[in-house]
Regions:
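Short, solvent-exposed amphipathic alpha-helical segments in soluble enzyme
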Residues: 75-79, 103, 158-160, 188, ...
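Rossmann-like NAD(P) dinucleotide-binding subdomain of oxidoreductase/dehydrogenase enzymes
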Residues: 40-181
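Structural motif
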Residues: 57-61, 77-78, 84-87, 117-120, ...
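Conserved C-terminal structural/oligomerization subdomain of aldehyde/semialdehyde dehydrogenase
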Residues: 264-371
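N-terminal Rossmann-like NAD(P)+-binding subdomain of aldehyde/semialdehyde dehydrogenases
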Residues: 1-50, 220
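Short secondary-structure boundary segments
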Residues: 91, 146, 208, 348-351
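ALDH superfamily catalytic-core signature
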Residues: 81, 100, 151-281
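Short, surface-exposed amphipathic charged segments that create phosphate/polyanion-binding patches used
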Residues: 134-137, 178, 239-248, 286-289, ...
């Protein structure tokens, strides 16, 4: 399935998609297999309260091009566990691999005794048809993973929605951080599947006291720091300022290919493109979410400025999603967590893998990072 996804979408690395598929299946299964989801799930005789769970009904699940098979697998497993039928609507550029993932699950479900048609899929559909399915009176719940426009459309459908939208993830490398460790973890995360995880770091905020060391450590790992002229070349290639979205052509592509698209000469072994920036927002588009091995880089004079920068980055496209910090100072970590508007605050952890859960921490494994 991982190879099929790479062949069809031309995004990411199949070796990393294998890991995503494993998290979506094996890790999720081990996490929820003992959890009762239907019937009496809690009974408190002292308070005389009994909690009863029941299926919600047909689920309409929209899946993305960036994590196609893993998202299909995950949404099907949690739907079957809660006894809800599910209809998958895959991204048009990932329909074959997504349908194959759904077919594998459906055949396994039938062999295990599940009812016919418990898992269905729409191989092709227009935008109008997808909107009609979201608004259908028999749709009980929508699981919408995709762009801001898609998630907003789901919320306008009139049916209950769990929306999984974009993230613009800042990572702060504090003065007390173990810099070589921090850079290694960010490198592992941002190069994972060529940066297609929406929880991957988008902007580094270093402290003035350790900025030079951070730069040196990234260069050891073949990261390429862009000049101002190169940043100006890359911006229109990576981001559409008129539509305020990253360009599909760079999503999940290797750093060397993206540099070539922008007419930037980089060494053949370049792993990341890093853009030193001073501003945040649409006027500085590399500060926004780009699901590729591209990172913005800021230097803060002190902790207070670092917080302001991280809040700005978080605000521009990442509200409710993910933020990350590398620090050994517990008070600073707690303050950072309280200052960010994010569903997940990751500490001393690679954001891509850490946000998915089940590997670097004890967060529940999930391919739906809701915001």
């Amino acid at each position: 399935l991982a190879k099929l996804a790479c062949e069809e979408t031309k995004l990411g690395r199949w070796e990393d998609k294998v890991i995503k598929n494993a998290i979506a299946t094996r890790f999720v299964y081990n996490d929820i297999k003992g959890q009762k989801t239907v019937g009496v799930i809690a009974d408190d005789p002292k308070q005389e309260v009994v909690e009863v769970a029941e299926p919600v009904g047909p689920i309409f699940a929209i899946t993305p091009v960036t994590n196609p098979t893993s998202t299909v697998l995950f949404k099907i497993i949690i739907s079957m566990k809660s006894r809800n039928p599910i209809i998958i609507r895959p991204h048009g550029a990932a329909k074959d691999c997504s349908v194959e993932a759904a077919r594998v699950c459906y055949e396994a479900a039938l062999r295990a005794g599940a009812p016919e048609n418990c898992i269905q899929w729409v191989r092709t559909s227009t935008q109008e048809e997808a909107l009609a399915l979201m608004a259908h009176r028999k749709t009980a719940l929508i699981l919408a993973t995709g762009s801001v426009e898609l998630v907003r459309a789901a919320h306008r459908s009139g049916n209950p929605v769990i929306g999984i939208g974009p993230g613009n993830v800042p990572v702060y490398i504090g003065k007390s951080a173990d810099v070589p460790f921090a850079v290694e973890q960010i490198f592992i995360s941002k190069t994972f599947d060529n940066g297609t995880v929406c929880a991957s770091e988008q902007a580094i905020v270093a402290n003035r006291a350790n900025a030079d060391e951070v730069v040196a450590e990234f260069k050891k790992r073949k990261a390429y720091f862009l000049s101002q002229e190169e940043i100006e070349r890359l911006e229109p290639v990576a981001f559409n300022k008129e539509q305020k979205v990253m360009r599909a052509e760079v999503i999940g592509q290797p750093a060397t290919k993206i540099a070539e698209m922008a007419g930037i000469k980089v060494p053949a072994d370049t792993t990341l493109l890093i853009a030193p920036l001073e501003e945040v927002g649409i006027h500085s588009p590399l500060s926004l979410e780009i699901l590729a091995p591209i990172l913005a880089f800021y230097v803060a004079e002190d902790f207070e400025q670092a917080i302001r920068l991280c809040r700005q980055i978080n605000h521009h496209g990442g509200l409710g999603h993910t933020c990350s910090i590398f620090s050994q100072n517990e008070e600073r970590i707690e303050y950072f967590a309280s200052a960010m508007n994010a569903g997940s605050i990751l500490v001393n952890t690679p954001a891509s893998q850490g946000a998915l859960g089940g590997t670097y921490n004890r967060l529940r494994p999930s391919l739906m990072l809701a915001c």
